[in-house]
Regions:
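Short acidic loop-to-helix transition motifs that present clustered carboxylates
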Residues: 148-150, 171-176
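Aromatic/His-enriched, Gly/Pro-containing loop or helix-boundary segments
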Residues: 1-15
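Polyanionic/metal-chelating signatures
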Residues: 13, 18-167
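Active-site gating loops and adjacent loop-to-helix segments of metal-dependent hydrolytic enzymes
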Residues: 1-4, 48, 70-73, 185-190
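Glycine- and other small-residue-rich loops at beta-strand/loop junctions that grip anionic moieties
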Residues: 5, 120, 143-146, 169-170, ...
Length: 232
């Protein structure tokens, strides 16, 4: 799914956010799925179409999620994943499929015009189109993740399949691996003052953002994302 396909240009929250000084949004799909879909960057302008709000040349993003959300949503339906082990098996399976898809496309593209006349291109797959573009460094990866050990494991998966994680969202335990995040050029989009609402969100410290930002002598990257009760 693509977030831009469900945005409402007349949403009153745009005007409310503008009063608070927010001029640009990055809008992402939700966090119920291992691999949720594409996000988009838009200007906070009064326009009649999403296309006219898009920020010029901004890359799409891919929203992923780890931890309790996907295993709860699918486990409650009697489907996989229902454990954290299942989550990681699902990521790796998807990236293997994406590598194979990319390889088939590259092989086809390398053929001569004469060969292409008699051979059909690989069948298009919208999900794998997005993952392929991540592998080509054309889409930025954003991951909903709370616990330190899971963020570290997600970094392992990214290295296994040679893509980069741009940011972890929420990251209440990011302070525990601040140096690891800095070493890998990964930002934290973190809450300033919200935690404890579920098991994986308990172990927070109020210095979380500062610790992540100042890691490795100031080479870290942390931004504050809203914890406003109105959902902005």
């Amino acid at each position: 799914v693509w977030a831009e396909h469900s945005m409402w240009v007349q949403d009153p929250q745009y005007a409310l956010a503008l009063k608070g000084g927010v001029t640009i949004f990055h809008v992402l799909p939700g966090s119920a799925n291992l691999i949720g879909g594409r996000g988009v960057t838009v200007k906070n302008l009064q326009r009649n179409t999403i296309q006219s709000m898009k920020y010029p040349d901004a890359k799409h993003s891919l929203k992923m999620a780890c931890g309790e959300n996907p295993k709860r949503v699918y486990g409650n339906r009697g489907q996989a994943p229902s454990t954290r082990m299942g989550n990681f098996a699902g990521y790796r399976k998807a990236w293997i499929e994406a590598e194979n898809y990319l390889n088939k496309i590259e092989v086809y593209d390398s053929k001569s015009d004469e060969e292409k006349m008699v051979e059909s291109p690989p069948k298009r797959d919208l999900k794998l189109d997005t993952l392929r573009d991540v592998l080509k460094d054309e889409i930025l990866v954003h991951i909903h993740c709370y616990r330190a050990e899971e963020m570290a494991l997600m970094i392992d998966v990214a290295k296994e399949f040679n893509y980069k994680i741009t940011a972890f969202h929420h990251g209440v335990e990011a302070y525990k691996i601040a140096d690891l995040l800095a070493d890998n050029g990964i930002c934290g989009a973190l809450w300033a003052d919200w935690w404890g609402f579920k098991h994986e969100a308990y172990d927070m410290v109020q210095a979380n953002i500062a610790i992540v930002d100042q890691a490795r002598g100031g080479k870290g990257c942390a931004i504050v994302h809203s914890d406003d009760e109105r959902g902005i």
